[in-house]
Amino acid sequence: MIDKNVIQICKERLVAQRSDLMNRLHTHRLEFFERETGGDEADQTVSLLNENRMFIAQQRMRHQLMEVELALSRIEKGTFGICEETQEPIESQRLLAIPWTRLSIEGAEIRESQDQKRA
């Protein structure tokens, strides 16, 4: 069983992380629409490279936001802190470090070895 204080701390961190990610995504969106277009070929190339970097950063932030939302959902359902691989409680230190994690250290090792076998 996960300590209720750990769950509360994780929930607070997740809510703060969600807010930060949403603000950053909004800022990226504004920057995208405010960018300058036109210019010579070199300017257009730099612009395309910057757009690509922004797109990749937004994808990462959206993925992280999804993980945060899923973790908050698990808190509401009462399944937060249970490893998806082993069905055992995730270590409190790990949850405090990575509150959106779905795997214990053991579960992460199992999943990693399975992924390596598939590759």
Summary of predicted features, one role per range:
Residues 99-108:
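Cysteine-rich micro-motifs
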Residues 1-77, 112-119:
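Interaction interfaces in information-processing and related assembly proteins
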Residues 9, 85, 99:
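Amphipathic alpha-helical recognition patches that constitute DNA-binding helices
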